[in-house]
Amino acid sequence: MVDEYVAVDVETTGLSPERDRLLEIGAVLVQNGKVSKTWGTLIDTGQPVPPRIRELTGITDEMRKSGVPVREAVRGFLEFRGRLPLAGHNIPFDFAFLKQAAVREGMELEAEALDTLKIARKTLPYLPSKSLSALCALYRIHPGSAHRAQDDAMAAHELLQKLWAEYGQQVPDAFVLQNLFYTVKKQSPITNRQKGYLKDLLKYHKIKTDICIEDMTKSEASRMIDRILLEHGKIM
């Protein structure tokens, strides 16, 4: 197994890389199997944190507003990671959001990775749950604040080392780097007609928002318009 990698975890506003956004990135640089450096940031999405996500992560709107723009966050992660392979628990999920954000901001991201979830499925098939929290409990790894990016990235690194120590000799093929793939669909920008209608709706219904309308995609604008019409009604 590689002894130098970056363990990463992200928190997001939902489950869809296309529709939802990065809320937090946490990363841990590992060299010779030991933590060398850590990096992390909250991200200001410009949108309120959904109640379910706020309850799950503990990330509030005040915390979100203290974060950096997504461009700065993605650039910071790419600089921290360099060209090292990644590691994480269900890493394809994290990679999909990172790749989507990178492409949106005109950056590139390709990676090989070790997925502790995939490794656990090969080495611990009898376990009823292979969630990060369940595996941390099994190996007595302190999980820190669950569903916070930095702590989950650290937990994934420690779990990877535990799995390697126990199963590296028995199941070496489980610890081979795998290429990560995620295809980003082309997003059309918001139309001038949508901009005008959305601004009119916000003004008419006296809705305050942190969202930058100019940066929205066509599909994002459509969803926001539909949501306002459903919750507040048409302009009379």
Feature locations, PLM:
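Acidic, divalent-metal-coordinating active-site segment for phosphoryl/phosphodiester hydrolysis
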Residues: 148-161
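Acidic two-metal-ion nuclease catalytic site recognized across multiple nuclease folds
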Residues: 159-236
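A short, structured active-site edge motif that brings together acidic residues
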Residues: 111-123
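Conserved non-catalytic scaffold segment of RNase H-like nuclease domains
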Residues: 1-111, 125-147, 173
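Short, glycine/acidic-enriched loop or turn micro-motifs at the edges of active sites
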Residues: 12-14, 118, 155
